[in-house]
Amino acid sequence: MRGFLHHLFRDKSVATMLLTASFIIGLCALAPSLFVLIVLDKYLASGITSTLISLSVGAIILLCFEFAFRQNRASMIQALNRKIFQPIVNALNKKIKETQISGEEFKTIEKAGAVIKGATNSSITGYILDWPFVLMFVIALLFINWTAAIIASIFMIIMMVLTAQRVNLNLQQDSTANLEIFLMGLMTITILAIGSYSVLQYGNITLGALIGSNILASRALQGANKFAKAREAIKQRDRATAQIISFVNKK
């Protein structure tokens, strides 16, 4: 991750804008779960239509803001990646044209170049930038439903460990996707089962808080999964970059 931070803060003004955009995106991402919580707890209790309309309009506006900021952030990330990695790719292409290399070495360098091209898309950097605000979801969960926060944290750790070890487990991409779906469904069942019991037996949580906390937990688990994948992609990109720089500088 040190390489990622160095890469990000090469242009401090762009880094500041990216972090600001990520903060706003994180806040706006809370809208669906808070909307469910307030509608189920407040509107159904009062029955005032104007309250529902106001809440719906507010939630839609926040979702639009989230979409707009994500689009803007993606454009900034792509521009930053091109500025940093395009010169490396150009230097590689020039070196290959000027140097005679074996077929095996060419395959290795070509693979490294493909890794860089694939890992410079905006999604990977975006997933890393979203990670602090994924943790914010867990903190919000602690105030809404601490049981769901603990369950979500456990599943997040499991998801991240399995994602990091997927090579050792020899899991294909389809198998990994199936595992993600399984963990997501299992977490939902666990949260709703324990939460429903708490609603009936202790009354220490409302129905709106239960459903809202499940939405937040799902977003947190998805964020953990994306972060783990992005972290592995960043590691591969750093190794590929080192290979290419070593090859380009070789006399």
Predicted feature descriptions by range:
Residues 30-37, 125-167, 172-214:
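A hydrophobic transmembrane-helix motif
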Residues 220-247:
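Cytosolic ends of transmembrane helices, especially the final helix of ABC transmembrane type-1 domains
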Residues 1-30, 45, 49-55, 73, ...:
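Membrane-integrated ABC transporters
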Residues 17-24, 58-62, 151-155, 176-180:
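Alpha-helical transmembrane segments of MFS and MFS-like solute carriers/permeases
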Residues 58-65, 210-226:
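Hydrophobic transmembrane alpha-helices
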Residues 37, 41, 45, 66-74, ...:
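Membrane-water interface at transmembrane helix exits
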Residues 32-39, 57, 73, 77, ...:
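Hydrophobic/aromatic residues in alpha-helical transmembrane segments
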Residues 1-2, 78-118, 167-169, 238-249:
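Extended non-transmembrane interhelical loops and adjacent amphipathic helices
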